[in-house]
Amino acid sequence: MIQQETRLKVADNSGAREVLTIKVLGGSGRKTANIGDVIVCTVKQATPGGVVKKGEVVKAVIVRTKSGARRSDGSYISFDENACVIIRDDKSPRGTRIFGPVARELRENNFMKIVSLAPEVI
């Protein structure tokens, strides 16, 4: 589960390497987010020459979490790290590549472009 002040790795080539969560979107007073939820972040580390600069406020969707997500068949899925993909307002990714696996829950939340770019969907 991701909450305010959580740092996440960025799993795309938008230029950001690490972001800090500012707000969890979706309802007033919502405290935590899980895989497939949209968050507002600020960029803490960025690569030189990238599309996204350090200090920029961006929206991102969570693609991997250490604390697992429960699926409808009763199984749980968890990853080794917390990671997100930076998105535009129309839910399309700002980068052109996705690194590492992403969860199948993104397909249910209509992030089809991220699912199609990902090397592996778990």
Curated annotation (Swiss-Prot):
GO biological process: translation
MF-aspect GO terms: large ribosomal subunit rRNA binding; structural constituent of ribosome
Keywords of this entry: Ribonucleoprotein, Ribosomal protein, RNA-binding, rRNA-binding
Transmembrane recorded as keyword: no
Top-level taxon of origin: Bacteria
A GO cellular-component term linked to this record: cytosolic large ribosomal subunit
Subunit field text: Part of the 50S ribosomal subunit. Forms a cluster with proteins L3 and L19. In the 70S ribosome, L14 and L19 interact and together make contacts with the 16S rRNA in bridges B5 and B8.
Alphabetized PANTHER family for the sequence: 50S/60S RIBOSOMAL PROTEIN L14/L23, LARGE RIBOSOMAL SUBUNIT PROTEIN UL14M
Known function: Binds to 23S rRNA. Forms part of two intersubunit bridges in the 70S ribosome.
Protein name: Large ribosomal subunit protein uL14
Provenance organism: Bacillus subtilis (strain 168)
